Structures are given as structure tokens and as C-alpha cells.
Regions:
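DNA polymerase processivity clamps
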Residues: 1-181
């Protein structure tokens, strides 16, 4: 997993100035041998899970929200050949390489409420093509290819559209809420 591409993809789904301030960032959770990144604006969601911890120095059980504005500035100083380590120390100070990141003190939404398995079928569902294109671009950024394919799950006309992708050392879920037509 390329950390910089992953963060750039997550930023494509992260709002810039949502009144729900806790959404203006990326949630990072260390759970055992896995790190989970979540980003949502309330209509789209992107979740990336990785077991590739080479550039992640985060203690088990720790979670935090990285402020989008802080990450926007920092990420531009790194290149594909210069991958920094995302670190959270014992005092909960978060850094990307040697640069400090601002974190958001708040409760991130329970993303697993919308990422759930179901066998319910539906014939018609509304899709906002602009949001679909934006989410598609984020997925292509993670995989670093223009031809990204994945599994599509539609549970119901009023439920989310789920895209699942799984690779050797990481996986991600992209989610799009249905549009009212």
C-alpha cells in the first residue's frame, strides 16, 4: 500500500468545511495487525484497511482524526519516492514524517452502521453521477491505476451502494448513498 496515494484518495472524499467539524478529517484506527482509515462526507464513504505497517507507527487500540487542512499542506511536501511514516506517539502527537499534524477532538461517525452485509435485492436505485465519478477517482488513486475494478453490492433503493476491493496487503470499501429521484 502506498501511504501517500491512500491519504490523497481519502482526502478526495473528506469535506473541507462541513458544519459537522469531525467530518473534516480522516479517522485512523489501529486494531491489532491492521490499520483502518475512514473518510466520509455523509453521502460518500471510503474505508481503507491495511496490514502493511511499514510506514505506520501507531500503537494498538489508538484512534484519532487527522484534520484535513493540516494534511493538505503536509502531503504536498512528499513524493512517491519519499514516503514518510505516519506516527502517533505516547502523548497522542501525530506526525507525518517530521511534520506535526493537527488532530480533531470529536467522535467520528460509526461507519459500520452503513457498511453492513445484507441479501436484500432492489430493482431501481438513484445514483448521483458526480459523486460516483468523484468516488471512482478516489479508488483509482488508491490502486494507482485508471482501470480499477471491484465488487458492487446494492442492498436496497434507500440503502448504500457498496464497492469492495481486496488485494494482498490492503483492502478498501467505497460507499455511495442513493440519490432521491
Amino acid at each position: 500500500m502506498n501511504l501517500i496515494n491512500t491519504l490523497k484518495a481519502l482526502l478526495q472524499v473528506t469535506p473541507k468545511s462541513d458544519i459537522r467539524y469531525y467530518l473534516n478529517g480522516i479517522q485512523v484506527i489501529r486494531n491489532g495487525n491492521e490499520v483502518v482509515f475512514n473518510s466520509t462526507d455523509g453521502l460518500m464513504l471510503l474505508q481503507v484497511k491495511t496490514t502493511d505497517l511499514e510506514y505506520l507507527d501507531i500503537q494498538d487500540g489508538v484512534q484519532f482524526i487527522i484534520c484535513r487542512k493540516s494534511l493538505d499542506v503536509m502531503i504536498k511536501s512528499f513524493t512517491k519516492n519519499n514516503t514518510p511514516v505516519l506516527r502517533c506517539d505516547d502523548d497522542f502527537k501525530v506526525t507525518l514524517g517530521d511534520l506535526p499534524l493537527v488532530t480533531i477532538d470529536g467522535h467520528y461517525p460509526d461507519v459500520y452502521r452503513v457498511i453492513r452485509e445484507s441479501s436484500e435485492r432492489c430493482d431501481v436505485i438513484g445514483v448521483n453521477y458526480t459523486l460516483l465519478a468523484k468516488l471512482s477517482k478516489a479508488c483509482a488513486t488508491i490502486t494507482n491505476t485508471k482501470h480499477t475494478c471491484g465488487k458492487l453490492k446494492v442492498r436496497g433503493a434507500t440503502d448504500s451502494i457498496l464497492f469492495e476491493n481486496s488485494y494482498d496487503d490492503y483492502s478498501f470499501i467505497a460507499l455511495l448513498m442513493p440519490a432521491r429521484i
